[in-house]
Amino acid sequence: MISDPIADMLTRIRNGVMARHEVVIMPASRMKQYLAKVMKQEGFIAGYEVIGAKPKRQLKIVLRYDEGGASFVSGLERISKPGLRVYVQRGEIPRVYGGLGVAIVSTSKGVMTGSQAWRQGLGGELLCKVW
């Protein structure tokens, strides 16, 4: 059993990028789908889909590379962990690499980027940073 499924997801994406894989497959959950949706909206991944039946659903993430073979994901960092949750208010949401990356925040209105949460005046759990 995995103690931190979100960290496992980020690690699988990181390993897939380093190995130059086109897709990575992992066990699916709603939170992972929300994270994949935000990453797709921000252009870090090419797409995602849920495959399989209910008890053993899998999340398939299609990684994105440019013409030179460089990945659009340079780095991923888990912030809030099961043993130490990190919550931020609107003004405490960090900028990632001067706006080149995104902070992903779980708010009362759903999972969104830090800038979207800031614009809506929301704080929440700071899940991870992607750049």
Swiss-Prot record:
SUPFAM superfamilies: Ribosomal protein S8
Keywords, sorted A to Z: Ribonucleoprotein, Ribosomal protein, RNA-binding, rRNA-binding
Gene3D superfamilies (UniProt xref): 3.30.1370.30, 3.30.1490.10
Top-level taxon of origin: Bacteria
Molecular functions per Gene Ontology: rRNA binding; structural constituent of ribosome
Biological process, per Gene Ontology: translation
GO CC field: ribonucleoprotein complex; ribosome
Cited Pfam families: Ribosomal_S8
Transmembrane segments: none
Quaternary structure and interacting proteins, as annotated: Part of the 30S ribosomal subunit. Contacts proteins S5 and S12.
Function: One of the primary rRNA binding proteins, it binds directly to 16S rRNA central domain where it helps coordinate assembly of the platform of the 30S subunit.
NCBIfam families in UniProt: PRK00136.1
Annotated family: Belongs to the universal ribosomal protein uS8 family.
Name used for this protein in its record: Small ribosomal subunit protein uS8
